[in-house]
Amino acid sequence: MEDRRIGVYVCNCGTNIAKVVDCDAVSDFAKKLPGVAVARSYKYMCSNPGQEMIIQDIRELSLDRVVVAACSPRMHEPTFRKALQTAGINPYFLEMANIREQCSWVHDDARAATDKALALAHAAVRRVVHHEPLEKRFVDMCPATLVLGGGIAGLTAALELSDAGQPVFLVEKDDHLGGNLARVDLTAPYLDSARDMLADRIRRVLESPKIEVLLRSTLQSLSGFVGNFRAEIRVGADGARTVDVGSVLVATGFREFDARRIEHYGYGRLPNVVTSFELERMLREGRILTRGGRVPKYFAMIHCVGSRNPEYHGYCSRVCCMTALKYGHEIKSALPGAYVYDLYIDMHAFGKGCEDFYRRTAEMKTMFLMYAKGTTPEIVPSGPDDDCEMLIKVHEVLSGEEIEVPADLVVLMVGMEAREDAADVAHLVSISQDKDGWFIESHPKLDPVATTTEGVFIAGTCQAPKGIPGSVAQAEAAAARILGKISRGKIEVDAVFAEVDETRCSGCRMCNELCPYAAIEYDAATKRSRVISAVCKACGCCVAACPSGAIQGRHFTDRQIFSQIEGVLEWASSQG
Amino acid sequence: MAIRANPRLVEELEHYGAEDVAKCYHCGNCSAVCPFSREPFLFPRKSMRYLQMGLEEKLLGNLEPWLCYYCGECSEECPREAEPGETMMSMRRWLTSRYDFTGISKLFYRSWKAELAAILLVALLTGAGFLLFGFRWGGGHLGVYAGEGAFLTTGAVHVFDWILGCVLAAFLGINCARMWWFSIGKDRTLRIPPLAYLRQAFLLPVHFFTQKRYAECGKKRPWAIHLALMLSYTTMLVLIMFFLHAMHSERTVWAAHGFGYLATIGLLGTSIYALRGRIRKEETHYKHSHETDWIFLILLVFVAGTGILQNVLYRVFHLDVAANVVYVVHMMGVVPMLGLEVPFSKWAHLAYRPLAMYFSELQAEAIRERERAVAAAGAPLPA
Amino acid sequence: MGVPKKIGVYFCQKEAALPMPVDWDAVAEYARGLPGVAHVEVRSPRPAPDPEVLAHEIKKRDLKVVVVAGDSPGHFKPAFTRAVALAGGEPTEVRLASFRQHGAGADDGTERAKAVVACAVHGVPFGLAASPRPTAVNPATLVIGGGVAGIQAALEIADAGQKVYLVEKTGTIGGHMAMFDKTFPTLDCAACILTPKMVAVGQHEKIDLMTYAEVQDVAGEPGAYRVKVLKKARFVDPDACVACHACMEVCPVAVPSEFDGGITTRKAIYMPFPQAVPNAYLVDAAACTYILSGGKKCGACLRKCAKELIHFDDRDEVVEIEVGSIVVATGYDVFDARRIERYGYGVHPNVLTALEFERLTNASGPTGGAIVMKTLRRNKRTKQDEWVFDAEGPRPGSVAIVHCVGSRDKKYNPYCSRVCCMYSLKFAHLVKEKLPDAVCYEFYIDMRAFGKGYEEFFERIRLEEVFVVRGRSAKVVEKDGRMTIKGEDILKDRLVEFPVDMVLLSVGLEPACASDRLAGILGIDRDEDGWFRETDYNIDPTGTERGGIHVAGVCQGPKDIPDAVAQASAVAARVLKSVVSGRGQGSRASLTVEEIESRARALAGA
Amino acid sequence: MGFEPRIVGFLCNWCSYTGADLAGTARIHYAPNVRVIRVMCSARVDPTFVVKALAEGADGVLICGCHPGDCHYSEGNYKAMRRFPLLGRLLRDYGIEEDRVRLEWVSASEGKRFAEIVDDMTERVRRLGPSRVKTLLEADRVER
Amino acid sequence: MPEKKLQIALYWGAACGGCDVAVLDTNEFVIGVGFLVDIRLWPIAADGKYRDVEAMADGELDCTLFHGAIRNSENEHLAKLLRRKSKVLVALGSCAHLGGIPGLANQVTKQEILERVYLDNPSIEAGNRVVPLPSTRVDAGELEIPRFYRRVYRLDDVVPVDYYVPGCPPAPEQVKAALQALVNGTLPPARSVIGASNRTVCDDCRRRKEEKKVTRFHRPWEILQDPDRCLMEQGILCAGSATRSGCGVRCPDSGMPCRGCYGPAPNVIDQGAKFVSAVSSIVDSKDPREIERILGDIPDILGYAYRFGLPASLLQRSIR
């Protein structure tokens, strides 16, 4: 260690640093530190001459470590790393001391600032001694993708990938493609044909030579890591397939809320209380009748069935309002003399064209009745003189009145909920679920399709309730991620990651659950944990937690940080 | 007890001009911008709501439409163009038809052809009647307009006026009584002490003659126009009912005629202004016109025009024959206008609106009293 | 094919349908000539089709298949479905031929409509028969707009190893998101999640970042566009500038800061914000004394810059680039609250728009995140009194937040801006967090808390004792010397008048002002509200009729950050797909009716 | 000269270090007593680092991470949050004053907050006086 | 058979004598040892005087097994003396290695100890307030007793140590192995830990390990434990993961958690801090109050974390 040849470069940043920090004092001080071969102070280290100076010194003085005391590493670390690389030494042999943003710009006492700069420079010198050469590595990327779920999201992603020439295995539990959308006839707000858009996609998928569709199939197990997954799939009753894939897209969709759970709506008990999907079928078949075979006159849509109610699901299912409005239009088209009521809480008509659709539904004299969140309308039998099957009683909040409306057909706008097998899927592909059972994305804002498991993506309603455009966009976004990885052929693994020293790991599994990216694998046979470096994001959580010191985080090793601690303090104690 | 909603009412109200009420999504903007809306009468949103839901009973007892003077601010600010102002107007028409026990009003509002036919019929009957009277029974001459031997004697006309007036007052009185019943009488929860009726009675003439509430609107011109029209009309009514002799005298009685001319000019001017407004549709409250509005305005212009024409013909040009003919024609306008418009159509509001001001004050007082009682009893106020 | 089916084609229109450049009679005539068509009927808007009458007709004519054609034929489909069912037919044999959905809004509307009808008659989805011919594709991509959507799309494409030109109008990337304090519903800090992405863009070797630049002209065809980009003079070399602030400190000019929503000022030589990418200064030529005086006055910065990087002789330059795909991510402008006079914006000093409040409450804002009222202060330079934010200023004791300002309103923007409910709730939260004693009112119409975790956030706000008033407030007035907000509390059946110290207007989103021009340059459509039109609302929310040009983010329609990001990534998929496979997507406009019809015929036979 | 505390700061790269940089770009002045060591995430801060710093003579240790829910690594800061109470108790048992070690959340936009925290901490540590750890350890040292 | 028997000494500093018992627990082996070595000093088993040791030539002893910590001047003196006389000095057991249980006294001051033992102790007769002093004047002259130090040291703190055999007490087999290596001359390079593994107790623990998420900590007697499952996962604070193995997993095998007597794993500098880090990492909550509650179940964290090694920790002692 003592024979290190360290170069220390103190940037004046014009006067930005030099105005407050005595840069020459810093370089003079550094010169005397053990291992320091050269120390210089210069006007602009980041400028070309500045970088040239470093490069030249590395070559001529055979420096093997470099410290730059300048601005924040967040600004110029890449610049100087490049300079080291140009000079022919490992770019990670660099350490920066931030004496601008965190020193000269925030202090006006020149002495104190210079002291601080000295301490920081000292720490950097101490640290850089322990820097190790790190290389970016690459792992293979298998171009095939496993898509779970043959609904609109799965179909879209499969098509995007296969159109780009990449193989896809599309696994669908059912015996046909289309998922929940196959049950829908028209879509809100433009009343376009869902059937056409599905027919188009299904046909393309089936005709694509790159897509292998596995119907009546389920994923049995998934092993490996990004770029190198192996999936076992059960096909049909007793077939089995093992496929190697580089990425997995989970697009398993949703299931509808079971309206039976809200007993007082009487679904399953009252003949003319139906779910939205049942009305959808009536409309699609052109047979809109009560159970008794009568053409209904009064339709009541009850919104938020199972949604926005803490007893069932606290969240909004996002599409039901627009679907109910759509039914309003459809009913008036199929039965021009019918009356439609919408019993709603808040009208969620937020998409493109949706507010307009809402307005037009209102213009068609759909009667909107607002009930309060936390309450529910009540369905009661009609009297002998009524010309309807049932009456709905509701505390209507916009008028403040208790009112009743006649109804022949009550339509329960059932919300979406996570599928019953979501937990199994989550476990198989090691992703997490939120409290409602939806799969959790890597970052709600900036990474809505990735998961914390590298190489596993989610799209569509398995992530959260959403409409068709949202599902399609997400599916394509996931395809973009996958294509991005495939198109580079290899997966670049950052040089900085955590690694387990297997000779020291005792398999205590303390770390296993800590990694948000599931980068830590436990091998039951050897009783050792292992960090999949391709998946690791180098946060260092496991490093800090490992009670046996078996995990080390590259470029942020205990050794390096200890030296830094000693560096900032030792100097200070000797000076002050 | 739950009230039954009726999806058909909103369809029915279309006949009365409420075409856009279904568009309302209840943002509450209108009630808040309305210069007249104040507790406990929050309108127009709430009335719109009752209408959307078809709560007929609620609407029938609702005086709020009468508290609205259609200044148009609500409609201007409505984000959905649901035309709350026009909806209130339509509700006034509907209420008029409901107060009217004969059902004639309903017929007129639902069919402008029926109204027009009725007007023509009454006009023809009136014309025929006056001609018969003039030529046969009155003993006058077509060549004499005023004084001795006049074609239509003042006395006879005066008697006719009073008979007509009494008939109209009877109709209107019954309708007003119905209005009271719907809005106050039927509601058992409202306790109004008899004295309160007396105490607040001053509101009737005040609102009748000043429409002072209209003046609370941000824009003053509509109020001024309306006031001019109302005062002109009232002046004319007083002149005709009480000073017909003076009006009819051979010489010009400026004390009467001065007012007469002023009132006629007022009537003509304001109604022409209103007609022009309804054609141009620049002002919000003129944007939507029901057929009955046109009929009424045309009648008004016609009556005022013929009224002044006969005067001018007689007094300026001394053309007695022409004046008499115009007089008959004038009466053919006046009688249907008064006979049909006052009890059964638009003109009824001259009675309903001051009454509504009066009743609503009584209601408000009773509501406040009830709330005070509830508060005193310690029960929580409705949130 | 066997015996041709008896097909009936019904042209139906709604009264309110938009005027479309379609000659219906010509299309009807064309439909008559299609195989199997037994009956063609152009229906007038009124009366609406009566299923029972239709059933009778269908039975009489023995139609086996019904094609409903028109702008939005879905509106009539249930009637026809029921009619066919009543007539004993197969309800699945009712097909739609939607002109609007399939882009018959362009100049060749009639031709497109014919093709749409032909596909429906053949029973082939239009998208299948009319998929554009693939083109060769230049692997480079142009991304227009450096907001979060543009950044995401650029990174996504560049990370896959493809060249990207990112053109941004202002001096830095970051867009609106960089201005935000927290993002709903997780309340994570916008800068924390955005700046790493911005830095990544700035440092990406595959991204050619052109800030302070505008697209001037686009020529060529899908897969091979030639784009002229106007690079406005920055007057400071962004690569060499070390962001030392020395120049800014001496600049005597102060103009409203765009980044701070106008609530603070910046200099004529400025960096939009401290984390700007590129992290360098630029000169606002419209404000700089030196430039305006032709070099006769000032020049203080010139003398101050130790690196001598300020070059006032810089000129705008036009560069031409060649790209295969273009991603449009130009974002939005916010609604100008001055347009609604009754809210008193611009009259009452403490009526703020959402963006202003974002900056006020931002830790990097003028008050360090303290929520204060504006106070009157004399400007030493102009000798005038000004309303300014001062970190030590008085804290508002009551704040009202008004939803839907400019949105859901036929007079302004009829559409829902989609994000305001949530950001308003966020504001309420921030107010309660920073000023626990402050009274906070929210005036809303519908609480559109529809996304993941949104409803829970709304519940949380309620627990924080924010007064949530259902009823959009009507106006802000001065009453007894205090600002007062008036509205109807619908659920409580009261007219309310709250004296408030501060009013926040939740202004909606509007298409960016230049989007009209850009649509012209790019040859893409805008919808009636001004947003760029996508190929298909549902299944192609990012494509445009012009092949190789994609839309992402809010410029296609209001959306929140997750949706904008997802869409931006989706666009990247489209671009990467074409680059990886070498097959770009051509314009659909290049297909003729005959071609589509023959393809549909072939597909139907297959 | 009075006592100038020596404080070691462990700042997470994504929020707090960026926030500290922002304080710089915004020229927000604060006490020069904190010497920053950058870590990728507050979860990397091993309690050992804290005791090491104290043993080496630090008068205070400041740990800063992203606000809860904001972590660049989803939930690293929660791990820091979990470790802190137990570490605090450990230090208390050692007799080290509570104010010497602090865990704070600083976002990338909170340059001002960072400055305030540093000032406040410096002031509190200044009031506590120099840490006795190192002096005592040195005094205890036995000649071998 | 070597020509000359090995000369060894066994000595105890501040210790309980358990390590001696551990030596004896090697059973018949220790008798065999007797044939191979001369035990020159072993206070617990044989008579011997300090002056005999002082009389030895430097390096005369081949090896000294020193157990016990350094608490007073006598301990230090003998440690230094034996160091001088021995070729090889072995720190036997936790006390010599890390400070051991006596090291827990570093939580309090010398003053507090004296007060507690001699003044505040309930077993002390009322009025008896005698505190020993290093030197007392009696009729016979100046009476000296060893000086009581401010704190406890490890052996290593006062003399350079060649080998460390951890454990409280060291497992007899490990003692046996160490003695055997000594006799056979197969000792590893100096300054290393012998008689222990390079991994932690978990490596040898037979209990099933799964994923760790703890919402409540229990004392061992508070719950009915699953005998096959990791104690930590059951909420029993077990230091096994942070402790060198070699003990034979005696505690967890008998249903008690590991207390950490073998000291930190080779790469770990501060056993207690690492343990705190690991334990708190697996607390399953994101709510500060909840976290406090869960961790609140752990009593006396300093005692737990450094039960056998407080003087070996980075901070070594309480600064009160």
Question: Where are these predicted regions, by residue range?
Answer:
Chain B
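Flexible metal-binding regulatory segments at protein termini and peripheral loops
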Residues: 1-2, 92, 96, 383
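Cytosolic juxtamembrane regulatory segments of multi-pass membrane proteins
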Residues: 194-209, 302, 361-383
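Iron-sulfur-cluster electron-transfer modules
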Residues: 21, 38, 48-245, 249
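Hydrophobic alpha-helical transmembrane segments of multi-pass small-molecule transporters/permeases
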Residues: 29, 33, 73, 77, ...
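Ferredoxin-type iron-sulfur electron-transfer modules and their immediate structural context
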Residues: 1-65, 350, 358, 364-365, ...
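Membrane-interfacial loop-to-transmembrane-helix junctions in polytopic alpha-helical membrane proteins
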Residues: 14-20, 61, 153-156, 214-224, ...
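Secondary-structure capping and boundary motifs in well-ordered enzyme cores
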Residues: 23-26, 60-63, 67-70, 261-264, ...
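Hydrophobic cores of alpha-helical transmembrane segments in multi-pass integral membrane proteins
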Residues: 91, 117-132, 158-177, 225-245, ...
